[in-house]
Every structure is written in C-alpha cells, then in structure tokens.
C-alpha cells in the first residue's frame, strides 16, 4: 500500500507541498531518508532512525525537521531514555534559539512583511494558512482525524502496536507545531 501511495502525486490542499515531486529534488532524497527512519523506528532501531534523520538534514533541512519531529516524538513515546534525551535536546535547542535570536546571528532577523513584500508573494496561496478556505482546513486536519480513526480501528481489532501509537503521536505533534505557528503567520512574520 505504501508503494502504491508513492506513485500518486497531488498538491496537498492550499500548501506548496506535493505528495511526490514529478522530478528529483533534494527534498525527495530527504523524504526517502525520513521514510527509512520511520522503518527503522518500526523495527525499534532508535539510533538508526536518529542517524537517518541527521543525514537528511544537510540534504533538505525542512524535510528533515518534519521527520525529526515525527520520529523524535515517536521515540520519546516508545522509550523513557529517549524521552529524557529528547526533552534535554528540546531544552538545549530552545536556549540556543533564544540566544541566537537575542544576541546571535538571528538577532533582528524576524521581520514583519511590508506591503511590497506581500505583493511579491500574493500569488502564493500556500504561505498564509490563516487565509485558507474552510475546505482546505477540513482536508488537511481531516488527515490527522483519519489517522486516529484508523488507529482506533486497529486498536479495536487488537492489531495496534506500540510503534503505531508512537507514530500517531508524532504525527499529532507535527500538526500541533503547525498550529502553533499560526499567530506568526497571521502577524505576517517572516522567518530568516
């Protein structure tokens, strides 16, 4: 089923993301490494999963970031030691980000888009999720609802594994992270 899904290509509603690119882009290689990381997680090879996400980072950093959240949360759900390491990693990353924003290389890099900037990106309907029509919200958030419905069905049949639960929570964390960015999107804050 996963192989068949990879043959499909469609634009994810109101985003600039496609389920699969029609050409080879570094994002596709990073996605492949992320998919291998998920496979490693399913086989409880935690450090292999972490290494695969790390290798994906220089290939395409944002794709690797999404897999880091998915796999990182899943590993934290599965393993207490990984949960502690993950919590420490999040704290260290937040401190480094705060320092970089306050006095380091990111100081002053957050900018509010002005009218000229907004005109330049006006055709990019994917940039401002706060302007999405209701159907796009239903389609995009409905994917998470569908995931949890399928998870509930597998649980009811006794087919659910701990890895399934962990990945469902990882996917939920991705959606939560997206939702947390909405105030910045509404304020038209541009990231460096």
Predicted regions span which residues?
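Membrane-interface micro-motifs in multi-pass membrane enzymes
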Residues: 1-41, 192
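Hydrophobic faces of alpha-helical transmembrane segments in multi-pass integral membrane proteins
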Residues: 2-4, 29, 33-34, 55, ...
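Short, Lys/Arg-enriched charge-dense amphipathic segments
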Residues: 19, 72-78
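Hydrophobic alpha-helical transmembrane segments of multi-pass membrane proteins
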Residues: 25, 55, 134-138
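Membrane-interface alpha helices of multi-pass inner-membrane proteins
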Residues: 38-40, 47-61, 67-72, 90-97
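Membrane-helix interface segments
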Residues: 44-49, 81-84
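Transmembrane catalytic cores of multi-pass membrane glycosyltransferases
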Residues: 61-67, 76-192
């Amino acid at each position: 089923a996963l192989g068949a899904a990879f043959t499909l290509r469609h634009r994810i509603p109101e985003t600039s993301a496609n389920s699969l690119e029609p050409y080879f882009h570094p994002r596709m290689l990073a996605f492949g490494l992320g998919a291998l990381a998920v496979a490693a997680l399913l086989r409880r090879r935690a450090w292999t999963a972490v290494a695969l996400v790390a290798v994906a980072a220089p290939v395409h950093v944002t794709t690797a970031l999404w897999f880091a959240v998915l796999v990182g949360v899943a590993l934290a759900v599965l393993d207490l030691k990984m949960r502690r390491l993950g919590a420490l990693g999040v704290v260290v990353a937040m401190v480094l980000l705060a320092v970089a924003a306050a006095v380091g290389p990111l100081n002053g890099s957050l900018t509010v888009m002005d009218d000229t900037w907004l005109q330049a990106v006006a055709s990019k309907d994917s940039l401002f999720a706060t302007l999405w029509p209701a159907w796009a919200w239903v389609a995009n958030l409905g994917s998470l609802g569908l995931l949890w419905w399928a998870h509930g069905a597998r649980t009811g049949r006794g087919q659910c594994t701990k890895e399934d639960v962990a990945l469902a929570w990882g996917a939920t964390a991705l959606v939560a992270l997206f939702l947390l960015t909405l105030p910045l999107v509404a304020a038209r804050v541009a990231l460096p």
